[in-house]
Amino acid sequence: YSHMPAVLKEFHRQAPKGRLFLRSMNCYEIRDELLAGSLDIGVFYDCVGGFGRSLTTHALGTYSLALVASPEIRRQYPDFITADQNIPVPFIINEPSCVFRQIFERYLGQKSIALDHTIELWSIPTIKNLVKSDVGISYLPRFSVQAELAEGSLAEIPTELTGTTITAVCGHHKNKWLSPLMQLFLELCTDKIRSEV
């Protein structure tokens, strides 16, 4: 979710004594903890499904994805469209439950494109730094690499996944009582989206 820093800044401005506990988790864990009632609010990508009407969700934005590499790696391996090929470059990405990883690995499987190996990291800034350093490629939400694409430290590699998007949502269990601080957080998240429309 690209607006989280601005939302958190405004939350702390409006509720300076409010205590907000943040945990980094994958989308499936967020969904499961929301369903179990052990998490108050979660921001996650809705493509994980499996929550039916048990969760109340608010759409925060739909984001395109991009296959990125350093300009040098893109020059060496520009073709991720032709099927049945081995590309000797690592895929640098989050853990296996990462939704954009799953989308790209499904694409590779459908195209019978094999990569050298996978490097798993939890930090998108670290992933981007390795990719910029010619270590491998990654498939990430475009908002997370927009600055690097604009400055030329990363280059996009075309795929047939053009138009693929993921939608970020803010959710809570439908039976969960929303405290004033939780309501403020939800309002800030949804107001940020409305201000852009």
How would you label these PLM feature ranges?
Residues L8-P16, A83-Q85, R101-A114:
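Ligand-binding cleft/hinge of the Venus flytrap
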Residues N26-L39, Y45, V99-I157:
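Hydrophobic hinge/microswitch elements
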Residues T56-A66, E151-T164:
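Short beta-strand->loop
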Residues S54-P96:
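Flexible hinge/capping segments at coil-to-helix
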